């Protein structure tokens, strides 16, 4: 009960602070340089391998010609190049170049041009334009962008490069790259062309190249401009239904078909499903609602530190009940405040919440700076030792998803407490995306899941019930054939991805060899992810998802974690706590 009382205090304090505070300390820039060179990190401060990424220099172009000159310089001098966005929210090491003499091209200052063509229903933006800037410009002109990721701390060039998405099986679907109708790309060229050139691609004219560039992982060149389809402005009406997860496996498909922007959040340990009833509404319907998703709101830094300390305490004492109490408190709080929906832009007063598409489709209020509040920030900001977690994101063919849900229910029913760790975060988040023409996209209508879970401060520290998370991971990617989201996941999620993509993988490589024959934009890390190859195994490699264990040493025998078969999916190999077998090293 002590943990429950403490967490309630944290929740109540956080509630009243976030009511009045919508601004916070902005995230730190991903690139930092000194006289010895530069380093680049992601927004979480730590790459999957926990190793620092180095480069010799960085350039900040502000125009397309600046961008072309930067690529030309690198091509002329045989330098490796990686593009880095202002936000750098990709979890895999895609932004890290090979070799310490490489050049980073930041698009953080390449963000001045947004051009709307009303008669064509398109908008073209510099690749460094932030999602929020783009939405505000489009909405201000009386239009809406049909979809977006739920997190707005991304640039337009960065978000399409990794396949970012919202949730929809309607129209062009929930993936932003499927709303792309044109891209300008800067690629290396021969000396007679000035060592670099701009390639302009249009839907219907250059589909072979465009289908590769839509989701490119940054290995084809530097995206200069993105042209998206837009539509007449509209509103959305949103209601959350917190209810039982009974028959979830039979309901999910109809839910995805019925609600244009619907999603489901499943808290398996709590046997609760939250169905989002999210439909389109006419622009003249009354309502100025805002989606200020709880997880993306500013958090008092002391609270973020406190929550992390509590979770570390539960881990070190193997306190499942503490995690379950936290999950109960978190879920109750989300229900109380509508998970961040606000009817008037200030507080939640009841359903439905109706607001403009641009105010409902994405959120991220913790991004924005304030001159008077320096005690609040995004909960995962690495400067403040707050939340630190893994994120597994799997994309299932619709036909395979029901069996996955049933497998997770079997795993849950053996001992629900084992899954409280993911329910502290956001449970298993379920969204819907359409089949795509992008070569690295999904080939058929699909269901996407996300789940977050605790990551230890030290790479060799095992985690409470980590075997259950690993079994779910292997259920998804191995047993049920899910593909990984390119911008998320631990390394094991990418194993065998080449085979899952099928013939489109060779089409992508053909374009890659044409646009960047010298592999200027590739690195060992992007190759590792794109090819899905398994690296050599080492002591403790399974603890952080860098391998699937096959020997005890791949876990941590000295702390009682051994390589075992899965509880439901017995072909899985996971690191499980077995205290009777502890080996003293």
UniProtKB/Swiss-Prot annotation:
GO terms for cellular component: membrane; vacuole. Pfam families: ALO, FAD_binding_4, GULLO2-like_3rd. GO terms for molecular function: D-arabinono-1,4-lactone oxidase activity; FAD binding; L-gulonolactone oxidase activity. Its cofactor is FAD. It comes from the Eukaryota. GO terms for biological process: L-ascorbic acid biosynthetic process. It catalyses: L-gulono-1,4-lactone + O2 = L-ascorbate + H2O2 + H(+). Catalyzes the oxidation of L-gulono-1,4-lactone to ascorbic acid. L-gulono-1,4-lactone is oxidized to hydrogen peroxide and L-xylo-hexulonolactone which spontaneously isomerizes to L-ascorbate. Belongs to the oxygen-dependent FAD-linked oxidoreductase family. This is L-gulonolactone oxidase 3. It comes from Arabidopsis thaliana (Mouse-ear cress). The lineage of its organism: Eukaryota, Viridiplantae, Streptophyta, Embryophyta, Tracheophyta.
